[in-house]
């Protein structure tokens, strides 16, 4: 069993490197079969990312968010299950460490 492939999907407030992070979805999977071994969804206090970490909001991306479903737009609403940015990144790191084999980890994602 090869648990070293990690798929990450990040929702942000823009497409640039300085955009605030809204949420992170991560899955550990087998590259050959596509079987998912573990998955996690982490909501982030994106406004805190803006205030403390310098995250930016892109006008075009904001317009995109406004045009999404009510469920998608709800991701932007502050709630108790959102984590501070540093805690969210630590949770992501711990999830990957817990579920991946001891060897190299291969991270997969689609760029904007």
Segments from the language model and where they lie:
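Catalytic and binding regions of secreted/periplasmic enzymes and modules that target cell-wall glycans
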Residues: 112
């Amino acid at each position: 069993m090869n648990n070293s492939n990690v798929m990450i999907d990040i929702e942000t407030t823009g497409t640039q490197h300085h955009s605030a992070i809204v949420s992170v979805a991560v899955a550990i999977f087998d590259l050959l079969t596509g079987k998912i071994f573990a998955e996690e969804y982490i909501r982030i206090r994106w406004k805190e990312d803006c205030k403390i970490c310098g995250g930016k909001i892109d006008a075009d991306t904001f317009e995109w968010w406004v045009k999404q479903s009510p469920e998608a737009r709800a991701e932007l609403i502050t709630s108790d299950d959102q984590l501070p940015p540093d805690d969210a990144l630590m949770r992501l790191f711990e999830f990957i460490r817990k579920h991946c084999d001891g060897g190299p980890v291969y991270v997969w994602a689609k760029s904007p």
